[in-house]
């Protein structure tokens, strides 16, 4: 039915058809060539029995669904040419939905439900709050703003739904069976509200099967079996179109408003982010147990990575410090077999004497030693016994903590005296004073004259404190039966020129051994570098193993998000109906995945620090690094976002009509 006063319809449908099925399933045509026009200010009732196609028609009118064929023009613009974001703009700015089932988000308060369209419109929070409270007060719900839907009666929930429809103006109210789930009194109140809105100039399109309800409209369109069978004015309710609303929705300015509105509204991202964070927190709190189980995977993953790397770094620093304590100018010389069938090379006393003459060398100390049984009283203990000269404390930077070191006189006389390591002292003497006591080394009595300062492990699990130093001459004569050293420790004259000293020793040894390289030279700096590389590899391996648990935590995030999308499908439909774009829904659920990851990551870091404290109490070397903590947290966040993307994308691609119809 055309209105001569308004030649350009606000809504115009021409030969609209809607089919379902196909692709191997039976095809059903729900709408069969529907054509109608609706002008600004009209109060229209679309009436029909269940299954007549009236709800499908409403979904197409409200841009929740697209027709299979035909044309739909809104204010002179072809809706088929609008993309999904532009149609979302129409739902947000032009339409307001009032559903039979209310379609309120259960976890949000009445005010938060009303504010939702304004959030996606980018309206500032203070203005949103004021407008939402004013609407609720206008509809008699001033005392119910903080109530959740389950705390409201059916009539109150429907009034919240109407307030939400009006939040962004609600120029066109689409009411689908608004009284269907209400008692007669509440239904009458809702219809009175719709009458009032129509009198104020809003376009009201009422979908109902009840002819008494339809009689409240100024125009009644009857739909039967997907076709319009009648379209007539209700003479008892004459039309009173509102010029104000029509001016607001003129076709001439719609293109500009669509171009402005379909892009990101100013300030919308902040409002949406805060809403996403609040929604995520509500969902996490409501499903506390399930959330805790999901967070547990992330917490364990982050804590594992941080602790493993901290233990690896602590071990590395400890070993490096202990190796460095022996001096970076140290060079080691020992015999070597150039091939499996050749005899082991021998470093002789003459070699030692020749090396001592080199200008690049500061000190030379031959060592003749091995792992031997040491006895004190009834205690037998295995320790490394090394025959050294008097330069031992200076070369290895290893002072004597108790007593004294042996002298040149002891060396010349092959005196059986011993300076024991810190660990040997603890094992054999405990807290007793060892100075002056005698120990048996391979049944040879040696008098303890000193105790070396504690040094710790030099590399791997070798404990440098598990040793005994005796005069080189005594070791050669009394214990090992040879004057040739097991190996030689050489201190370079300049710590910055260790490699030059090593080359000079190499050239000398080649001459002395007639070109035969039956010896091996290593320096402490190279050993430190090699050990550092080994420790880095170990740390990487530990971190990789721990990262697997972080990956498992990410899979947990994906599982919980898929479950969340399935459980909140109707909420997604509600958000789309109130103007959320696909990008808004995507950000909503990505934010929730990020929230899970952030909370889990922070809790994992806290747990890691607690574990580190316990390990430190147990004398385990632990060194937390900011880069490891930030890296683990970042990995948790990225993992959560990566694994949360698929569920978020699935949510964003849901069909609004199917989402609203889900249980």
Curated annotation (Swiss-Prot):
Residues that, per the record, bind ATP: 48-55
Locations listed in the record: Cell inner membrane
InterPro entries assigned to the protein according to its UniProt record, in alphabetical order: AAA+_ATPase, ABC3_permease_C, ABC_transporter-like_ATP-bd, ABC_transporter-like_CS, MacB-like_ATP-bd, MacB_PCD, Macrolide_Exporter_MacB, P-loop_NTPase
Membrane protein topology class: Multi-pass membrane protein
Xref: Gene3D superfamilies: P-loop containing nucleotide triphosphate hydrolases
EC number in record: 7.6.2.-
GO molecular function, one term: transmembrane transporter activity
A Pfam family hit: ABC_tran
Domain of life: Bacteria
Membrane-spanning parts: 292-312, 545-565, 598-618, 626-646
UniProt entry tagged with the keyword Phosphoprotein: no
GO CC aspect terms: plasma membrane
Record keywords, A-Z: ATP-binding, Cell inner membrane, Cell membrane, Membrane, Nucleotide-binding, Translocase, Transmembrane, Transmembrane helix, Transport
Domain ABC transporter residues, every copy: 11-250
Keyword Membrane found: yes
Biological role: Part of the tripartite efflux system PvdRT-OpmQ required for the secretion into the extracellular milieu of the siderophore pyoverdine (PVD), which is involved in iron acquisition. This subunit binds PVD and drives its secretion by hydrolyzing ATP. The system is responsible for export of newly synthesized PVD after the final steps of biosynthesis have taken place in the periplasm.
Family statement: Belongs to the ABC transporter superfamily. Macrolide exporter (TC 3.A.1.122) family.
Subunit structure: Part of the tripartite efflux system PvdRT-OpmQ, which is composed of an inner membrane component with both ATPase and permease domains, PvdT, a periplasmic membrane fusion protein, PvdR, and an outer membrane component, OpmQ.
PANTHER family: MACROLIDE EXPORT ATP-BINDING_PERMEASE PROTEIN MACB, MEMBRANE COMPONENT OF TRANSPORTER-RELATED
Protein name: Pyoverdine export ATP-binding/permease protein PvdT
